[in-house]
């Protein structure tokens, strides 16, 4: 699956966290998303994939070639999105080859994304942009990270001649409310370095 397709699929799923909830994860919507990620990871061929009782998802990509003795590496990303703005329903789309002008996000509500308001947009002229209809968050933080990590893992699995050390993946709930590592099981992340 291409990273763009994966990202659009992920942002369409509501995983907004709730800082007022005493539960962990703070919202029940994060668990089905975690289960879906675990199924994808198993289907692509990652080993030791598990969604634990607190909603964390772990998976492993064994070392290849002469890299078996290399130190382990881990990649982490969080599944929840910010509770600070509406997060559903996300109506994401791609603006192809952005022309540098205003982007009409929502014709009914006359919502625009304008370089006059956000001058940084000018840096992205000619590139493809992911946007919403302006009524919700996109969810790029951190579903873009999940999409990138899983797409890279899938690529390495499909190209086993590329040498790499052992890689662990971990996806966490509730980072946006400051509880992302409250129940993480570090024994499942045998890595010298994590990003």
Set out the residue ranges of the language-model regions:
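Acidic/His- and Gly-rich active-site-bordering loop/insert found
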Residues: 1-129
């Amino acid at each position: 699956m291409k990273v763009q397709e994966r990202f659009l699929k992920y942002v369409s799923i509501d995983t907004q966290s709730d800082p007022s909830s005493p539960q962990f994860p703070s919202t029940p919507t994060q668990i089905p998303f975690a289960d879906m990620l675990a199924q994808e990871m198993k289907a692509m061929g990652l080993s030791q994939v598990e969604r634990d009782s607190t909603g964390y998802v772990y998976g492993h990509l064994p070392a290849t070639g002469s890299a078996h003795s290399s130190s382990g590496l881990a990649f982490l990303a969080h599944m929840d999105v910010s509770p600070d703005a509406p997060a559903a329903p996300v109506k994401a789309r791609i603006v192809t080859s952005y022309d540098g002008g205003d982007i009409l996000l929502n014709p009914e509500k006359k919502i625009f994304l304008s370089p006059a308001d956000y001058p940084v947009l000018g840096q992205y002229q000619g590139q493809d942009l992911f946007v919403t209809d302006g009524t919700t968050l996109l969810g790029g933080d951190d579903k873009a990270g999940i999409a990138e990590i899983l797409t890279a893992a899938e690529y390495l699995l499909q190209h086993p001649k590329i040498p790499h050390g052992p890689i662990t993946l971990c996806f966490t709930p509730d980072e946006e409310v400051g509880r992302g590592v409250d129940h993480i099981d570090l024994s499942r992340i045998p890595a010298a370095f994590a990003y």
